[in-house]
């Protein structure tokens, strides 16, 4: 059985994230989406809220589980029998950082990292961009699923 791990902060989850998640779910028997709790990073939504949003918008994927974690990614992966870590790439600029992380993770655990380029229509999209648009009352409905857009609107009061 193959098991993939897709880690991220998902603050908030975007259609770009869902693109990578859904495509990964077609390739692996099981997929774990791990929402990172990073105390050094300021987030709009708590780890619990981000986990709830992801679970809601991925409920249609029967081979997927959403979880939260903090600590070393490879320890989490090894504890769960992960076959591969999957990372979405939007642009070459993402690759430079992700390659270093993939090499470190492999050295620490022997777990491979697979890079999945986003579909071109989402290559511009990032959670930080979505947060910025939402913060100023812009329409994010083409960037995030409806339940996420509603939570952003409630959070920023616009």
Predicted regions and their residues:
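Nucleotidyltransferase catalytic core that binds NTPs
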Residues: 1-158
